Amino acid sequence: METRYTHSPEDIRHYSTEQLRKEFLVESIFVPGEVRLTYTHNDRMIFGGVTPTDKPLTIELSTELGVTYFLERRELGIINIGGPGSIVIEGTEEPMKKQDGYYIGKETKDIQFKSEDPANPAKFYTVSVPAHHKYPNVRISIDNIEPMVTGDSSTLNHRSIYQYIHPNVCQSCQLQMGYTILTPGSAWNTMPCHTHERRMETYLYFDMKEDTRVFHFMGKPDETKHLVIANEQAAISPSWSIHTGVGSSDYTFIWAMCGENITYNDMDMVPMKDLK
């Protein structure tokens, strides 16, 4: 497990491109046959990829957590962005095709991840945050989620937001997680942009061609910086930072948040005139 520490806005003012990428970009997430996780001290979120091939994988306990098993004091969200597979939760196997999700509550001890075809493995994107209460495990299908459609084709930001782990779908302590699909011809996500001082967020960008890039903007609104992001890479967004991006071609992204509350619309909008 890789660890990333927190930063003040003043810390990053003079960062080089290399320094910024080292601190806020996670480049290697889905590695066949491996579990790749990142522990960010921003609200203590753990996120990453589980990519089983010819044998099941489990999330092994790390000394950073100081507990006897991974979800002893945590909850977990999962979305499959790869081939068909399954997760085995305390002996019960659940099939997971692409876009299927799962919420797994605190105190769940045994979780295994499997792929049907090692040549086309499942890619389980996982996000875990601290939890104070055990809520029921819930299987989540994108087919059962009413998307929130927002933006407009004239502003190149028309998109459908599927809220997977959200009070309308399932209970959670503080984790929110969802899947945003841009309408063909749109390029911007989360524009106009915002911050939310009460929550941090991560973005996983995927479903991108090899030569497609997303220019992900971050930083304080009056002092923005950017990360150039390739397929299946993720960005860490502290609570004080804007988080918005524009793609050179089609892409999809998964967002995940945690912090003080689970009120999706609790955000501070940034007028375009204030961006620099």
Model-identified regions with their sequence ranges:
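Conserved hydrophobic/aromatic beta-strand scaffold that supports enzyme active sites
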Residues: 78, 93, 101-103, 124-126, ...
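Acidic, low-complexity central loop/insert segments
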Residues: 82-130
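Conserved metal-binding segment of the jelly-roll/cupin
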Residues: 96-116, 228-249, 258
